[in-house]
Amino acid sequence: RAIDLYTGKIKWTYTGVKGYIETRPLIEEDKVIFGAWDNTLYALNKNTGEELWKWTGGLTRMHFSPAAVWPVAANGKVFITDPQRAMTAIDLATGETIWRTYQSTVRETIGLSTDKKRVYSKTMNDSIVCYSTQGDKPHQLWSSNVGFGYEHAPSMQVEKDGVMFGSTKGGLIFALEPLTGKVLWKYKIGNSLFNTVVPI
């Protein structure tokens, strides 16, 4: 539902979601886009709540839902990852799949470069990968071995001031050079899961 910022009154309600929602929604153009634990990514009109499209990508098991990832958008595409270890580019206007790749075994994390030319994701073992947001086929630009081991925490990659930041389930925070993937530094703060970092 959408709630008026100043009055607290409900502006619209959408009742078509069949699973629970944990993601941060993406606001892009006239759309609000989010996934839920029902195999579905939803796009609604941000002003009215009208359903514009739904994407399932053929997912049939609830545990493969694109629900934990925070969707990002660039060049007319929405980019997501999911527990089926795939990265997907979806047409922002229609909800049709442009491409879907299992090449890097990514899972439930994604980040967008500040110039919107690249998306980042975390693999399930050691590495960060970077793909181009341009074109209609998946194009990996680099892969960087950060050395964090087995990983499945849904913490997103964040770029700021020419540095890409990330974190892990094992308490590691790291920084990479966005164009090459070169590891700039990494620091283990503890042994617990770290959520998405917020560089300031």
Give a label for each model feature:
Residues 4-8, 45-48, 91-95, 132-136, ...:
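Short loop/turn segments that connect beta-strands within beta-propeller blades
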Residues 7, 86, 94, 118, ...:
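Sequence-structural signature of mature extracellular/luminal beta-sheet repeat domains
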Residues 9-29, 53-74, 83, 96-115, ...:
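Extracytoplasmic beta-rich repeat domains
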Residues 32, 78, 119, 163-164:
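Hydrophobic beta-strand positions that form the internal "hydrophobic ladder"
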Residues 36-37, 82-83, 123-124, 168-169:
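Structural signature of WD-repeat beta-propellers
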Residues 40, 60, 86, 127, ...:
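Surface-exposed, flexible loop/turn segments at secondary-structure boundaries
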Residues 169, 176-178, 188:
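Short, loop-centered acidic/histidine patches that primarily coordinate divalent metals
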